[in-house]
Swiss-Prot record:
Organism: Arabidopsis thaliana
Annotated EC: 3.1.1.-
Residues that carry a glycan: 107, 140, 322
CDD domains: SGNH_plant_lipase_like
UniProt subcellular location: Secreted
Protein name: GDSL esterase/lipase At1g28650
Signal peptide: 1-26
InterPro entries reported for this sequence: GDSL (IPR001087), SGNH_hydro_sf (IPR036514), SGNH_plant_lipase-like (IPR035669)
GO biological process: lipid catabolic process
């Protein structure tokens, strides 16, 4: 009897050890991956050329011309910056090529990355926004359109790869944006009230969440999901709401109530991502804190190599912030600074390469990601960009 109990106890102990070992190994494998590709969705913050390719050749957007791209790409690549974006610095760190835009690309391999992000894109469909009285004239390539396009071409992507579809997605870092910012930008710039705009928050969060679930069902395992920016520090927003009565933070010069709105979106997004993580424990859903990774640059610009005037645009003209709505970067009579690396803001709406590099470093080293990336399987790694 004693022998039987002893054997049973040993068997139970062995099974428990095996169980917990399996859990640890599975967790380790889901955390640290040698990503073989990047799949990207979003708007101009991640657009590597889609909007330019989608545009009429006789009416190309400003990002198709200098000074866009003047710090790195020569000629312009269609990125809304003077150079590289966060997605580019992540690709460099992973040893992958810059992620090519899907739309308009010819004779391009997507085996190591594909990008559907489009300037002006929204999380919510254009038709829905129009019904709410919100104009969205830049593009109809919303998040759902990007995702459906990806689903349609997925069989072809897998056919050109040695991996099956689920394996391909599992080996990819999936970048979900930034997306949702334009859903707020349009109504803010159209004069909608803060209460009207707040009603969109749960709908936008749901759209992002639903897209993640769809990609999980297809085999996605690692998602980097950015939050919103501190829009109260945006050159364009500071110009839009520039009145004698508007309250500014005495330390940064930003508009507090706009930043609180961005924080509200981010808190709701984090709550949703936590719920998704509980539902899909085998998946790694990483929140990218774009808000604080950028806000620190406004708090201590000199510490990060920027001028002590971080709210002004490098490329622009007029006003307190070197920016005038309707007379913007790339247009006749609009100049740009000779040292973009000393500026946080590029064109009033978008950021400089130097800013995106600092943000990417903060994401990759884990300071601004929850949970932090685990790079232990890579051996040595460098976050300097």
């Amino acid at each position: 009897m004693t022998t039987t109990l002893l054997m049973a106890s040993l068997i139970v102990s062995f099974l428990l050890i095996l169980y917990y070992t399996t859990i640890v190994v599975a967790s380790s494998e889901s955390r640290c991956r040698r990503y073989k590709s990047i799949i990207s969705f979003g708007d101009s913050i991640a657009d590597t050329g889609n909007y330019v390719h989608l545009s009429n050749v006789n009416n190309l957007p400003q990002a198709a011309f200098l000074p866009y791209g003047e710090s790195f790409f020569h000629p312009p690549s269609g990125r809304y910056s003077d150079g590289r974006l966060v997605i580019d610095f992540i690709a460099e760190f992973l040893g992958l090529p810059y992620v090519p835009p899907y739309f308009g690309s010819q004779n391009v391999s997507f085996n190591q990355g594909i990008n559907f992000a489009v300037y002006g894109a929204t999380a919510l469909d254009r038709a829905f926004l129009v019904k709410q009285g919100i104009k969205s004239d830049f593009t109809n390539i919303s998040l759902s359109v990007q995702l459906n396009t990806f689903k349609q071409i997925l069989p072809n992507l897998c056919a050109s790869s040695t991996r099956d579809c689920r394996e391909m997605l599992g080996d990819s870092l999936i970048l979900m944006g930034e997306i949702g910012g334009n859903d707020y930008n349009y109504p803010f710039f159209e004069g909608k009230s803060i209460n009207e705009i707040k009603e969109l928050v749960p709908l936008i969060i749901k759209a992002i969440s639903s897209a993640i679930v769809d990609l999980i069902d297809l085999g996605g395992k690692t998602f980097l999901v950015p939050g919103n920016f501190p829009i109260g520090c945006s050159t364009a927003y500071l110009t839009l709401f520039q009145t004698a009565t508007v309250e500014h933070d005495p330390f940064t010069g930003c508009i507090p109530w706009l930043n609180k709105f961005g924080e509200h979106h981010n808190e709701q997004l984090k709550i949703e991502l936590k719920q998704l993580q509980k539902l899909y424990p085998h998946v790694n859903i990483i929140y990218a804190d774009y808000y604080n990774s950028l806000y620190g640059l406004f708090q201590e610009p000199a510490k990060y190599g920027f001028k002590n005037r971080p709210l002004a645009a490098c490329c622009g003209v007029g006003g307190q912030y070197n920016f005038t709505i309707g007379k913007e970067c790339g247009e006749n009579g609009v100049s740009y600074c000779q040292n973009p690396s000393e500026y946080v803001n590029w064109d009033g709406y978008h950021l400089t390469e130097a800013t995106y590099q600092k943000m990417a470093q903060g994401l990759l080293n884990g300071r601004y990601t929850t949970p932090a990336f685990d790079w232990s399987c890579l051996g040595s790694y460098d976050f300097s960009g």
